[in-house]
């Protein structure tokens, strides 16, 4: 539950900051503060923070700080693109190297044949590259308000759809002792 809150909390803070706190600068500030609080709580309670959370928070702190200092919202808008490309590269390289990173993230939930982890790595890489392109299209062609709404109400459903589309692969290739 804490991990879910640490992922969703900053997004909710960003949305609330934008629509109720006076725009993208305040939204960025609220998201930065919430992210630092969430990652700190994760560390205090779980005594660990995932590498992806560290990467995500670091990119957020850099892009968010530049946004606040410069007053230019472009930097916070390219943060998702940067993260999606980084994650896409991580999953692509782990597939190429036959050491699927996604296996370590999901192995406690589902156990799969090794070749299925590789396939899932490539699919996840493609998803992240696709999301990078979509983010670029939205922030470059639409208003701040549209981008914020997309960030909150578009990315989550798209991600959910991607996950659902992976279920046939997971169910077909799961090992007998898998939890799903």
Curated annotation (Swiss-Prot):
One Pfam entry for this protein is IspA
Main location as per UniProt: membrane
Tell me the compartments it is located in: Cell inner membrane
Q: Which domain of life is it from?
A: Bacteria
User: Membrane spanning segments where?
Assistant: 25-45, 49-69, 76-96, 118-138, 150-170
Alphabetical UniProt keywords: Cell inner membrane, Cell membrane, Membrane, Transmembrane, Transmembrane helix
- Please report the record's description of how this protein sits within the membrane: Multi-pass membrane protein
Stored InterPro entries:
YciB (IPR006008)
Q: Does the keyword Transmembrane apply?
A: yes
Q: Which cellular component, as a GO term, is one annotated location?
A: plasma membrane
The UniProt similarity line reads:
Belongs to the YciB family.
Q: Which HAMAP family match?
A: YciB (MF_00189)
The job of this chain, per UniProt, is described as: Plays a role in cell envelope biogenesis, maintenance of cell envelope integrity and membrane homeostasis.
| Protein name in UniProt | Inner membrane-spanning protein YciB
């Amino acid at each position: 539950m804490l991990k879910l809150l640490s992922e969703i909390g900053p997004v909710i803070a960003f949305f609330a900051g934008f629509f109720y706190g006076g725009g993208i600068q305040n939204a960025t500030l609220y998201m930065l503060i919430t992210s630092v609080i969430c990652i700190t709580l994760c560390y205090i309670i779980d005594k660990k923070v995932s590498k992806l959370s560290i990467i995500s928070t670091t990119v957020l702190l850099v892009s968010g700080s530049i946004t606040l200092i410069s007053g230019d919202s472009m930097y916070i808008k390219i943060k998702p693109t940067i993260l999606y490309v980084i994650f896409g590269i991580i999953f692509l390289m782990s597939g190429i190297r036959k050491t699927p990173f996604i296996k370590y993230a999901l192995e406690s939930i589902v156990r799969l044949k090794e070749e299925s982890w590789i396939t899932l790595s490539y699919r996840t890489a493609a998803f992240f590259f696709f999301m990078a392109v979509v983010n670029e299209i939205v922030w470059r062609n639409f208003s701040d308000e549209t981008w914020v709404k997309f960030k909150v109400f578009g990315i989550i459903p798209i991600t959910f759809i991607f996950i659902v589309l992976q279920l046939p692969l997971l169910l077909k290739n799961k090992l007998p002792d898998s939890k799903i």
